[in-house]
Amino acid sequence: MSKQAVLLDEAARQSLYSSCPAWTIASDGLVREWRFHSFVEAFGFMTQVALLAERANHHPEWSNVYNRVTIRLTTHDLGGLSSRDAELAQAIDSLSPTT
């Protein structure tokens, strides 16, 4: 992850449509939902994401209901969508199934 986070300008936000196509771009962050076959599978995914987030020192807002996981990424310190959110979204995508 980059050391210095910067808010994404409009061009960078537009590039997220190709680099993070499964994510919804909100005014101040990125949101994505996954559905798994079971709670255990969902929790395993969350554990992997937690390890990524801890290494990046950038932690998601998330919820889990049975086999469903929803993640929202935003950079509170900067008040919006930043390069750190985009980088973490791409890292999460690298380990997530296409559900």
From Swiss-Prot:
Keywords: Lyase. It comes from the Bacteria. It holds the Pfam family Pterin_4a. GO terms for biological process: tetrahydrobiopterin biosynthetic process. Its EC number is 4.2.1.96. It catalyses: (4aS,6R)-4a-hydroxy-L-erythro-5,6,7,8-tetrahydrobiopterin = (6R)-L-erythro-6,7-dihydrobiopterin + H2O. GO terms for molecular function: 4-alpha-hydroxytetrahydrobiopterin dehydratase activity. It is an enzyme of class 4 (lyase). InterPro entries: PCD_sf, Pterin_deHydtase. PANTHER family: PTERIN-4-ALPHA-CARBINOLAMINE DEHYDRATASE (PTHR12599:SF0). Belongs to the pterin-4-alpha-carbinolamine dehydratase family. This is Putative pterin-4-alpha-carbinolamine dehydratase.
